[in-house]
């Protein structure tokens, strides 16, 4: 029973570390760079650039819209 618990705990830690490493090369999409919007919506006129390649949002259904 203890072995299963330790394996489960190890799996949770490894998945968490993998999620962190996935965004290590990107900055969080936030002020002053941009704002996160739903992927199906267009970026607003004052933030027309879709900069999801450089910035990430916490929700996978969002994209980052940045200023020019």
From Swiss-Prot:
Protein role: Induces neurotoxic symptoms on zebrafish. Has also been claimed to be implied in calcification, but tests on homolog proteins suggest that proteins of this family have a neurotoxic function and not a calcification function.
GO CC term, one of those recorded: extracellular region
Name of the protein described by the UniProt record: Small cysteine-rich protein 2
GO MF term (any one): toxin activity
Post-translational modification summary for this protein: Contains 4 disulfide bonds.
Origin species: Orbicella faveolata
Similarity annotation: Belongs to the Cnidaria small cysteine-rich protein (SCRiP) family. gamma subfamily.
Cell compartment(s), UniProt: Secreted; Nematocyst
Leader sequence segment: 1-24
């Amino acid at each position: 029973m203890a072995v299963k618990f330790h394996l489960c705990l190890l799996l949770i830690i490894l998945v968490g570390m993998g999620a962190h490493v996935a965004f290590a090369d990107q900055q969080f999409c936030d002020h002053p760079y941009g704002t996160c919007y739903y992927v199906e919506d267009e970026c607003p006129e004052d933030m027309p650039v879709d900069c999801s390649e450089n910035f990430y949002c916490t929700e996978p259904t969002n994209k980052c819209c940045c200023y020019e």
